[in-house]
């Protein structure tokens, strides 16, 4: 039965009005409020104006979109639709709700400074810790409410009649969203922080804090410009849901709305449900992370029965094995790919199919047949080896200028790659070509059509935002031009970093070209395909034997790409939460500049003022293990990457995956247009290749348990108990992530950092580290390796 059209009258004097209708569907019964959410209006108690909102057009739009995007054979539910997000995203707006307040800006700058500074500091420490942006979202709410209760309602008079209120009232949803947007940008600077550390401590180039800020500003301003120009393509289209931002939007709803509709006989409110799950997640995470770490690796129990067995550890191990037994009680392990509760079921199917085929079928076949002598090394590792089975020390084959010395290379050892590393590179290249071919095949519908229809969207979110002025596209273009100027100054002003302006320009062009295709995939699947290997391959062939040039080529392009995608995510949050577009632009612009200053200043200060930092003699374990790993990787790629992957190189076959990706993309496209109503329309060819490219950082236990949880929630529960899923699924996702994030901080700062866990040991803490799974036992002995000729 079609939901009736009606007009909802909203009076600001009445809070929490609800309108309920029940829609009977042949698949399930949905309790909804004419898909316009439960609480209609946030209001200002000081004003009593009257507003009429007609949602009939939105209802028809939602029905059309839902039918077009989610009707699949067998009534299976594959996707997250526009109708689903109406349960947690407000479909009303009050222009009188203050967003750009003094309180918001102070809290945003304060939280961003603390979190970004802590992240930059602890990046150099082992073990490291990072604070997720969702922690700021949680902390901001009590801080905002505390501000409301203790700060007097004074006004500051500024020139030209401007008045700034110190306390504009209760901490509201828009302020909360703005604060989160600001912090989310500031905490995404790990890549550029790593570059500063590599340059100063490992390459020995004294770039100084000023040049570090210049590099950061160049990256952020370019990202801001591209993300702004792409708003009509990536943010405004209502079919681009961006599932990765929905859990944050769900938290905004439960903190600022009080509605409580019944779902499958569950009457518990979203807020109460969130705190129950949050507390349970917080308490439980202490067990797999500290008290009983074996719970995190339960899938490896078969290898524990015989720890010395290399074969058992290779098949069932979860650290250096395939992880064939899907069992873990650690949410951090389950959600290491992405949060499975917010990943659409079609994307889960594509990604897990990719993993099963490439990692559980192809990879073992190549490994046990000993192609390229990979059976002499661990089956699942990202290390690079010598012919003697030791970790490769690239500093033994370079001169004082960090350039390759061929004679030293021949005397030392050729580079030997493990099978997981090889497959990772091959799949990354295949994902690139598949993604780009699909992008060009769908260019009219994915790019041209959104641009042409930017003023014609009939969804309620776009309609409500039409009352606000948008930023002129010229401002974004100017930002890109300024970033290019800063990049030219950085590359041509000094001559100690091996890269010139032409390399910088090409890197930025590649990053910009990849930005929209990658964002389109993430906006639909919540999964990010890594292009790191592609950037490194291009740089390795272009800057032959110049690892420092590779580092900057990779950092300029990949850094711009990452920041632009973060900014687009944040812009979508602003779109959902009805934050004025000009304010969103101001937040993104300001946060990028502030992040450049804070991260560069903290990292640079530590580099120049902390004694022995990034050495084995460093105090407080400030050994920079993660940046050192990245340094070794960039060094090897820059020195020999072009040789080992060229036509006469030992691993040249990976280049064929450019063709493999293109063929897969064309075949899938032909099947989709030939059978438009079949399940092929949900298949993404880039995910069929890039879905498994996260290995060896994550293994089988991560993929299999992630897919199992996604199947349980996003297929079984959604299909059988849709009203429960619609009300509680995203709340569950947010609560689990928040519980783990907060518990991780408590464990680190209260126990690990203070040394409290150093003497805590029993079977549950040692069993997973006692055998071949931890050591990475190889199938064949390293003594039997025959040194390959050439590169």
Swiss-Prot record:
Keywords annotated in UniProt? Glycoprotein, Membrane, Peptide transport, Protein transport, Transmembrane, Transmembrane helix, Transport
Q: Subcellular localization, per the record?
A: Membrane
* Pfam (any one): OPT
Gene Ontology MF term list: oligopeptide transmembrane transporter activity
How is this protein situated with respect to the membrane? Multi-pass membrane protein
What GO terms describe the biological role, i.e. biological process, of this protein? oligopeptide transmembrane transport; protein transport
Spans through the membrane: 104-124, 131-151, 177-197, 226-246, 274-294, 309-329, 346-366, 421-441, 471-491, 501-521, 533-553, 583-603, 653-673, 697-717, 733-753
Q: What is this protein called?
A: Uncharacterized oligopeptide transporter C1840.12
Its source organism is: Schizosaccharomyces pombe (strain 972 / ATCC 24843)
Q: What is the lineage of its organism?
A: Eukaryota, Fungi, Dikarya, Ascomycota, Taphrinomycotina
């Amino acid at each position: 039965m079609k939901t009736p059209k009606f007009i909802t009258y909203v009076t600001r004097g009445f809070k929490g009005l609800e309108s309920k209708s029940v829609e009977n569907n042949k698949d399930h019964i949905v309790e909804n409020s004419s898909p316009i959410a439960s609480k209609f209006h946030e209001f200002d108690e000081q004003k009593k104006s009257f507003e009429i909102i007609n949602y009939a057009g939105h209802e028809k739009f939602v029905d059309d979109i839902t039918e077009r995007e989610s009707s699949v054979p067998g009534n299976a539910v594959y996707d997250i639709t526009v109708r689903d997000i109406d349960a947690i995203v407000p479909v009303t707006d009050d222009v009188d709700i203050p967003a750009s307040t003094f309180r918001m800006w102070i809290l945003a700058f304060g939280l961003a400074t603390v979190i970004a500074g802590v992240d930059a500091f602890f990046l150099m420490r082992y073990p490291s810790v990072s604070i997720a942006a969702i922690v700021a979202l949680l902390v901001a709410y009590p801080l905002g409410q505390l501000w409301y209760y203790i700060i007097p309602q004074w006004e500051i008079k500024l020139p030209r009649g401007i008045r700034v209120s110190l306390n504009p009232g209760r901490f509201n949803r828009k302020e909360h969203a703005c604060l989160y947007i600001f912090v989310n940008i500031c905490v995404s600077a790990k890549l550029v922080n790593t570059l500063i550390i590599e340059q100063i401590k490992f390459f020995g180039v004294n770039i100084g804090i000023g040049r570090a800020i210049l590099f950061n500003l160049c990256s952020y301003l370019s990202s801001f410009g591209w993300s702004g120009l792409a708003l009509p393509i990536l943010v405004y289209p209502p079919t681009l849901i961006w599932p990765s931002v929905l859990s944050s939007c769900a938290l905004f709803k439960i903190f600022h709305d009080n509605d409580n509709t019944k779902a499958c006989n569950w009457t518990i409110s979203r807020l109460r449900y969130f705190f129950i799950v949050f507390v349970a997640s917080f308490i439980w995470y202490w067990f797999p992370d500290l008290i009983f770490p074996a719970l995190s690796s339960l899938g490896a129990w078969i290898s524990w029965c015989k720890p010395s067995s290399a074969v058992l550890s290779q098949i069932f191990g979860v650290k250096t094995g395939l992880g064939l037994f899907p069992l873990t009680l650690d949410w951090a392990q389950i959600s290491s790919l992405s949060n499975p509760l917010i990943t659409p079921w079609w994307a889960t199917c594509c990604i897990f199919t990719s993993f099963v085929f490439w990692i559980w079928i192809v990879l073992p076949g190549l490994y046990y047949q000993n192609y390229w002598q990979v059976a002499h090394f661990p089956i699942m590792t990202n290390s690079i080896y010598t012919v003697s089975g030791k970790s490769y020390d690239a500093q033994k084959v370079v001169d004082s200028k960090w350039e390759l010395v061929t004679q030293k290379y021949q005397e030392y050892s050729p580079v030997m790659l493990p099978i997981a590393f090889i497959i990772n590179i091959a799949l990354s290249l295949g994902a690139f070509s598949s993604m780009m071919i699909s992008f060009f095949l769908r260019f009219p519908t994915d790019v041209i059509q959104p641009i042409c229809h930017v003023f014609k969207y009939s969804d309620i979110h776009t309609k409500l935002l039409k009352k606000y002025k948008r930023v002129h596209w010229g401002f974004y273009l100017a930002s890109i031009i300024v970033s290019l100027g800063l990049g030219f100054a950085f590359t041509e002003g000094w001559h100690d970093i091996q890269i010139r302006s032409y390399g910088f320009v090409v890197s930025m062009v590649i990053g910009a070209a990849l930005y929209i295709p990658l964002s389109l995939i993430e906006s639909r699947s919540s999964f990010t395909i890594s292009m790191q290997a592609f950037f490194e391959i291009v740089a390795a062939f272009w800057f032959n034997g110049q690892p420092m040039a590779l580092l900057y080529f990779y950092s300029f392009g990949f850094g711009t790409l990452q920041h632009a995608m973060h900014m687009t995510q944040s812009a979508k949050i602003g779109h959902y939460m009805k934050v004025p577009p000009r304010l969103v632009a101001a937040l993104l612009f300001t946060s990028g500049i502030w992040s450049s200053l804070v991260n560069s200043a903290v990292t640079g200060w530590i580099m120049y003022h902390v004694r022995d930092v990034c050495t084995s003699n460093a105090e407080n374990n400030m050994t920079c293990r993660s940046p050192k790993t990245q340094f070794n990787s960039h060094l090897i790629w820059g020195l020999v990457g072009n040789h080992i992957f060229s036509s006469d190189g030992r691993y040249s076959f990976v280049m064929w995956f450019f063709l493999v990706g293109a063929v897969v993309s064309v075949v899938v496209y032909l099947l989709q247009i030939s059978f438009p109503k079949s399940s092929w329309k949900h298949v993404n060819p880039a995910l069929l290749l890039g879905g498994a490219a996260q290995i060896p950082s994550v293994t089988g236990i991560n993929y299999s348990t992630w897919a199992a949880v996604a199947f349980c929630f996003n297929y079984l529960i959604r299909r059988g108990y849709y009203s429960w899923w619609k009300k509680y699924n995203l709340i569950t996702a947010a609560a689990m992530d928040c519980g783990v994030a907060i518990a991780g901080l408590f464990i680190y700062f209260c126990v690990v950092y203070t040394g409290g866990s150093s003497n805590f040991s029993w079977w549950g803490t040692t069993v997973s580290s006692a055998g071949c799974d931890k050591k990475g036992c190889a199938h064949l002995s390293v003594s039997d390796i025959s040194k390959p000729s050439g590169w």
